[in-house]
Amino acid sequence: SLDGVSIASRRFYEIYHQYNMKGIEFIPFERSEGYYACKFVNIMKFDVERSKSIRIEYQGKVSYGVLDNGKCAICQRSFGHHHPFPYRMTVEDEGKLKQNTFYRSDIEFEERNYQSPILWATDGIIQAFTKEKCRIFYKNVEGYFGEGDCGK
């Protein structure tokens, strides 16, 4: 969602339990049966230092480690900053990973009109969802909000 809450469908919930996945507590919505807010219980540290070594080019600008998403042309509100792929956790946390488990980053990133943590899935999860012919990761789609990027 736009405020960083991850929402799961009943299908996701069923596959998660069928394959004995770990790392998420599901909180059912009272008025939307079959949908759940996800509370990620395993929090890993995003490795800010390692991300600084990644050279990136974005819209003609060269940067290391952090992308400035720019500002609204009308109100000058910042669209935030984000770190480029690959999104890495610290080496210490990488050594603690368990199979079939979800993790989230300790910090959240803002881009345009939403903010959220980075979500990681370990071995077994992608394979399970592929086997069940179910997509779990979707590209974020930005819409047209009027004259300025913020809708003003």
Language-model regions: role of each:
Residues 1-152:
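Extended, low-hydrophobicity, polar/charged segments
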